[in-house]
């Protein structure tokens, strides 16, 4: 790695750090602006004003916003996520099991979506303009156009209501056999794979086509090199950066999509935990869950940018 590539990587890491600071401030402000009073929601409408005020004092809700933000940010840096208002339990303990469930869902989806998307995207680019390419393009655009909640609802109607093959709800904590694993994860994974694969196929196809249109590929064709050799030896290595970018952007789509999927299928993941926390105005839990999603998205995008820099032939 030369000095220019190294400086670009360091610059990208610094941008990621600054972005993380801005995002943490935005998350704190967004949760602070949620309607409703946290103390009143915890105690109920029948609580006396004195009891509500006492709870507000105990939870430091009357402190200035900047002081509460600094206290929260300091805790994050020290690895202390705080205590849940609603459950009176350490947030790290609440999140740990749910985060594992969400990572399982994302991992299984990625294992399915990435090979499917790369295969269809690359072959579609190689056969550009053919019937196969047009069919792949039409299907992917159609899938991208359908909202994720529609795909999830349709899956429930088809597989759970009409065919009765799969359960409508996913109880991930009750999986003990492979068949049980398939039954629990099938519909959430199918729903997420549709959206992620469609996005990735489109971006992978565009990246490979852009590389195939470069002069050195055209020169290799004129010299009589086989199309397969050109794609494997010339096009794919130079399209690696854009393809990794496409994969990272598509997988980051999981972060938003998992919120809808976990809610519809009642999947016990971190997104479902955050939705439940919003209902009870459990601010520390909402903030911690939101930061995990933001950090996950930022890490994916940063890795994609760094791989793009390191795979650029002009920077080697």
PLM region descriptions:
Residues 1-5, 62-118:
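An internal, D/E-rich "acidic patch" concept
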Residues 57-66, 81-91, 172-185, 192, ...:
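Membrane-interfacial helix-loop-helix junctions in multi-pass membrane proteins
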Residues 2-30:
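Charged, compositionally biased N-terminal leader segments and the immediate start
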Residues 15, 23, 112-113, 140, ...:
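Transmembrane alpha-helical core residues of multi-pass small-molecule transporters
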Residues 19-70, 163-184:
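Hydrophobic alpha-helical transmembrane segments of membrane transport/permease proteins
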Residues 26-33, 63, 71-74, 138-169, ...:
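Membrane-water interface segments at the C-terminal ends of transmembrane alpha-helices
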Residues 2-8, 97-132, 148, 177-316:
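Alpha-helical transmembrane segments of integral membrane proteins
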Residues 23, 27-31, 152, 156-160, ...:
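Juxtamembrane/transmembrane-helix interface segments of polytopic membrane transporters
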């Amino acid at each position: 790695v030369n000095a220019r590539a190294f400086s670009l990587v360091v610059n990208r890491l610094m941008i990621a750090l600054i972005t993380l600071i801005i995002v943490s401030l935005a998350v704190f402000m967004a949760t602070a602006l949620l309607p409703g009073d946290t103390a009143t929601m915890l105690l109920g409408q029948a609580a006396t004003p004195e009891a509500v005020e006492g709870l507000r004092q105990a939870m430091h809700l009357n402190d200035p916003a900047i002081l509460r933000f600094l206290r929260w940010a300091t805790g994050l840096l020290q690895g202390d996520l705080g205590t849940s208002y609603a459950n009176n339990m350490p947030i790290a303990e609440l999140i740990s099991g749910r985060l594992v469930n969400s990572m399982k869902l994302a991992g299984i989806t990625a294992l399915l979506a990435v090979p499917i998307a790369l295969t269809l995207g690359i072959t579609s680019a190689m056969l550009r303009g053919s019937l196969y390419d047009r069919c792949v393009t039409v299907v992917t655009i159609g899938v991208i156009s359908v909202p994720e909640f529609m795909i999830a609802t349709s899956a429930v109607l088809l597989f759970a209501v009409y065919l009765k093959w799969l359960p409508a709800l996913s109880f991930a904590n009750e999986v003990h056999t492979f068949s049980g694993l398939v039954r629990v994860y099938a519909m959430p994974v199918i729903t997420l794979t549709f959206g992620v694969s469609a996005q990735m196929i489109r971006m992978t196809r565009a990246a490979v086509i852009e590389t195939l249109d470069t002069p050195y590929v055209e020169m290799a064709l004129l010299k009589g090199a086989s199309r397969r050799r050109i794609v494997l030896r010339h096009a794919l290595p130079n399209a690696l950066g854009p393809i990794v970018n496409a994969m990272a952007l598509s997988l980051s789509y999981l972060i938003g999509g998992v919120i809808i999927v976990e809610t519809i299928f009642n999947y016990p993941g971190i997104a479902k935990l955050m939705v439940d926390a919003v209902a009870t105005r459990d601010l520390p839990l909402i903030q911690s869950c939101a930061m995990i999603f933001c950090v996950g998205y930022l890490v994916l995008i940063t890795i994609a940018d760094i791989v793009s820099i390191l795979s650029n032939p002009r920077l080697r």
